[in-house]
C-alpha cells in the first residue's frame, strides 16, 4: 500500500526495505502514544519506536521513524485533538535507524523545532547532519542550547562514553504529566510474547523458529514464540553463545528445496544452528507476566 511506502530505504537497506507497516498505540491515555515499525537484517527484526508526548500547546516527537503515510495520518489524528507538532527530538548521538528519518520527518512538520543529542556521529563515515537532510536553521543541540519543554520535561544525559570510533550518549526525558521515563537504548523491556507488530508480518519469527533451512515456514503460536526468543538473543548479543554456523556444504544441502524457492524463505538458506540451552539463555532475558527490564 502507498501509505506504507518508504522511498529512502536504500540509504539504510534494512528489512522490510521499502514497505514499513506501522502500529499505533496509546500508552498513557491523553498523554503518551507510540508508533512502531520493524527493522532488521536477515530477518533479525525488532520493533523500533517513535514516542509522541503531549506538551503544552501541542506534541513532541521523540526518536524519528520513516514518515510513511500511516505515520503522518496517525500524527495528524493526534494534532486534531492536542495541537500541532512543536518539537522533534533525536536523543542519541549515534544510531542511523532514528537519524536517517529525521530529515524527512522534519520536512513533514516544517514548523517544528528540531533537537539533537550532542556529539552526533555515524559509522563508517561521520557525515554532517545537514548532509542527512536535517535542517540546520531550526536545529538545536540538547543541553548545549537548552532543552525542549522544560516546564513539563526533565532531561538528563546518560554518558558520554568513549567508544573509540565515536561516543555513546543519550539524553533521556522524564515526562512529568504522565510520569513516564523516555529512554531509547540504555534500557529495554522484553516480554516472552512477540510484539503485536509481528501480527502484521510474522515472517521473521517463522524464519528463525526453524532448525534447518529445508523446513517450511509454519505459522503457529509456538513457532512465533520460539522465533521471538531467538530474535531476542540475536538483538541482545549479535552472536549468541548457543549459536553455531553450519558448514557451507551443510548449508547448501538443505537449500533450494521444493516449496522454499522464494525470497520470503531465502531459498532455504538458513546459516544458523542452535545448540542445546538456547531456550534457557533466552528465558533469562524475557519476562512472562511483564517485560523484564535489561540495562543495555
Predicted features, each with a name:
Residues 1-73, 127-217, 233-243, 247-248:
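Catalytic core of the metallo-beta-lactamase
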Residues 57, 65-66, 76-87, 93-108, ...:
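Cap/insert and terminal regions of metallo-dependent hydrolase folds
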Residues 4, 31, 37-39, 73, ...:
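Residue-identity detector for glutamine
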Residues 6-9, 33, 115, 121, ...:
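A residue-identity detector for tryptophan
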Amino acid at each position: 500500500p502507498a501509505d506504507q511506502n518508504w522511498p529512502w530505504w536504500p540509504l539504510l537497506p534494512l528489512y522490510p526495505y521499502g514497505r514499513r507497516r506501522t502500529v499505533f498505540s496509546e500508552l498513557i491515555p491523553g498523554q503518551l502514544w507510540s508508533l512502531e515499525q520493524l527493522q532488521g537484517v536477515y530477518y533479525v527484526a525488532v520493533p523500533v519506536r517513535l514516542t509522541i508526548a503531549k506538551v503544552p500547546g501541542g506534541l513532541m516527537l521523540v526518536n524519528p521513524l520513516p514518515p510513511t503515510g500511516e505515520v503522518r495520518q496517525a500524527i495528524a489524528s493526534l494534532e486534531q485533538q492536542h495541537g500541532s507538532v512543536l518539537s522533534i527530538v533525536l536523543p542519541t548521538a549515534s544510531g542511523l535507524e532514528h537519524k536517517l528519518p529525521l530529515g524527512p520527518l522534519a520536512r513533514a512538520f516544517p514548523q517544528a523545532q528540531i533537537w539533537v543529542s550532542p556529539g552526533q556521529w555515524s559509522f563508517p563515515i561521520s557525515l554532517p547532519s545537514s548532509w542527512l537532510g536535517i535542517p540546520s536553521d531550526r536545529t538545536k543541540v540538547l543541553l548545549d542550547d537548552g532543552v525542549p519543554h522544560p516546564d513539563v520535561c526533565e532531561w538528563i544525559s546518560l554518558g558520554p562514553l568513549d567508544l573509540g570510533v565515536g561516543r555513546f550518549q543519550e539524553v533521556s526525558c522524564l515526562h512529568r504529566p504522565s510520569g513516564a521515563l523516555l529512554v531509547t537504548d540504555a534500557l529495554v523491556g522484553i516480554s516472552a510474547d512477540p510484539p503485536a507488530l509481528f501480527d502484521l508480518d510474522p515472517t521473521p519469527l517463522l524464519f528463525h523458529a526453524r532448525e534447518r533451512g529445508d523446513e517450511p515456514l509454519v505459522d503457529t503460536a509456538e513457532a512465533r514464540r520460539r522465533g521471538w526468543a531467538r530474535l531476542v538473543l540475536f538483538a541482545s548479543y549479535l552472536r549468541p553463545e548457543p549459536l553455531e554456523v553450519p558448514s557451507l556444504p551443510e548449508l547448501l544441502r538443505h537449500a533450494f528445496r521444493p516449496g522454499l524457492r522464494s525470497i520470503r524463505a531465502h531459498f532455504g538458506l538458513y546459516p544458523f544452528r542452535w545448540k542445546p540451552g538456547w531456550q534457557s539463555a533466552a528465558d533469562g532475558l524475557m519476562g512472562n507476566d511483564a517485560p523484564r527490564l535489561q540495562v543495555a
